[in-house]
Amino acid sequence: PPPPPPELAVDTTNRPDKLVEKLEQLKPGGGGALYDAIYMACTRRSLMKGEPIEPRRVLIIMGDGTDTASEHTLEEVLELAQRNLVTIYGVSTVAYGFGSTGEANLIRLAEETGGRVEYPLEGVYKDITGYISKPSDEGNYAIKVGTGGYATELAKSLFESVAAIAGEITTQYILRYVPKNTDSPKAFRKL
């Protein structure tokens, strides 16, 4: 059976507890309609009270960039995000030493909308493979099985990646200009 269509779990909010609650309910799984989810995020968004008419829009994608079931294409969602001034950031779930067919899509989505991709799992798995290939008393016990250390390292890496993105978002400025050539007013122009 095809995967279910994307659903809006939490609309625009200034309550982080609502986001955390939904994030805790997420389950990892294979396959999905990433581009359809981006399309929905770019088109279905409520304004909050006191928010400017054209607020800053940021989308953080946590995953490997693979899309297996979308009705929309990568090109469609890129154009939509660019026209709606949506900056896309990625938090890659690809582990150190592994690849993903969707990784190029995640990079493209981020770079072509002014964002970037974080790789939180690289450091965790790099350290673990380092401990295995260069055994030492200290290294062998760095992430001890059954202690929760591994899960803690994963959570810490993911948190640090999202915090780095949040820090970058809060220290950016938006510049706009009115083009002289108005033949194609909806065309995205790169500065």
Predicted regions and their residues:
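Scaffold/interface architecture of coatomer-like assemblies
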Residues: P1-L191
